[in-house]
């Protein structure tokens, strides 16, 4: 007869979780469900996802980004910029098996909580990092969220709207996939530590996960002549669509002078900065757009105002300006364009498989480990190639 509290695979393991929003917390949630003790580290007042809510008839607003991915965790609130908080986190990390973090590259090092800082005190610590773009070079240190990463990785142009507008995926596909990949990588690192005594530094980039999800489609463009440089599609006469339920506007594809740009600026400070950069500071005080929820309710009017301002520059000009000022914006690339971008090359996302004339280029799996290169370049086997090895009678 089963016991009321059966053993779980991660019983006795402690995880220190510095992540927020969706992808990182989902990885922590997987570990909680497998038995780990996960201590969530939040800023005073709690992480931002606690405030992103949806309204359902007859009940208070639900924090639909926060609630599904933080079940059973423990929470501490600290200001990581203070020396007291740093010392508290160092002591906690001394007792942990895993650290999860998802800040922009270099942030934890500036706080004195990077992998070298923590692992010099706790050599058995596995340090798992989630980033938007990998932090591998000049194109990889930008901030990014699901919508923008998906667009830049080619996910929004394969099935455009009837008007030609990039199709925004209506749920957090890249976030959720990245969370599961990060959890898988942590489990592999724990097994590596238990079997081989190696405590690894694990890295997962959401962009790499998004590319990996489209490996079949991108392979077609990796194994033929080079494509043209990325360029926005011509702007069609677009119809308006209804507002969305989540209070995360503006987060969509918007028309510019020559095509579409994908922008996510729903955080209050980002919204204010966007308004000033596009020359519309008056929108900050406009009551229709004063809060996240009102911007969502008045989505059609919001889109009209933004596109009126964005019509003054090309999509590429806006991307350069907004990114230079720390906002999340990108072109919605096609698959053909993705494989020719500097970011794609910077993240070392391809493998040469096979030999000679049979060599093909494929997409590698996204998780990276400091202690070994997680790739195999042998070609797939022919059907039944190993029958004699495994099916022969002893």
From Swiss-Prot:
EC number(s) recorded for this UniProt protein: 2.8.3.-
InterPro entries in UniProt: CoA-transferase_III_domain (IPR050483), CoA-Trfase_fam_III (IPR003673), CoA-Trfase_III_dom3_sf (IPR044855), CoA-Trfase_III_dom_1_sf (IPR023606)
Single GO MF descriptor: transferase activity
Disulfide bonding pattern of the chain: none
Keywords tagged on the record: Transferase
A Pfam family the protein falls into: CoA_transf_3
Top-rank EC class of the record's enzyme: transferase
Keyword Transferase set for record: yes
Active-site feature positions: 175
Assembly behavior: Homodimer.
Similarity remark: Belongs to the CoA-transferase III family.
Entry text on domains: Consists of a large Rossmann fold domain and a small domain, which are connected by a flexible linker.
Function of the molecule: Probably involved in fatty acid metabolism. Binds to fatty acyl-CoAs of varying carbon chain lengths, with the highest binding affinity for palmitoyl-CoA (C16:0). In vitro, alters the cell wall lipid profile and protects mycobacteria from acidic, oxidative and antibiotic stress. May play a significant role in host-pathogen interaction.
Record-given protein name: Probable fatty acyl-CoA transferase Rv3272
Lineage: Bacteria, Bacillati, Actinomycetota, Actinomycetes, Mycobacteriales
